[in-house]
Amino acid sequence: LPALGLSIKSPAGLAIDKFESCLLGIMIVLILNRLAGQSVDSLYIRRGRLGLSLTVGLVALVVMTAAVIPITELFFKGKDLSWARILPWIPWALVMILSNAAYEELVFRGLFIGKMEPFLGKFATNVVTTIPFVLNHAGNNYMSDAFIFFVLQLLPLSLAWCWLTQKTNSLWGSILFHAA
């Protein structure tokens, strides 16, 4: 980032850092999947029920965007926020959240759902992929109440993202929903 004249603490620096980290992780998964003789279809990178997938994902994204200020203040220690203050950050925030959502949905759902479902069934697969996803977010310092975040917010959302992937046979909607 210094070569680009960006500070890691700037919105652009944070976004580019997140993007390159997620891109590296995604590329590793795709390459190893290919070396294992699997197609991207096995990772739920496919059309599936695209209309339903995109509808649910985009509705969630619009609703959460409309509620971003109160949610950020309530759960993520946001202070003195206004649309005028956050608008300049939105392009960089979109890069960060879409990169992160694509990476996490690929790793936690794309890699495991298709391989676990034949043995565990849909519901158990949903629960088994949700537990490590939620635990992976433990220990962060960006929210004000860990119990509320994990039990009342992240756990049901993770179950919903997995359900959406299973229902639509695709990651696209869960990526957008997760980004929301």
Q: What positions do the PLM features span?
A:
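Transmembrane helix-loop-helix hairpins at the membrane interface
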Residues: 60-180
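Juxtamembrane helix-loop-helix connectors linking adjacent transmembrane helices
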Residues: 2-100
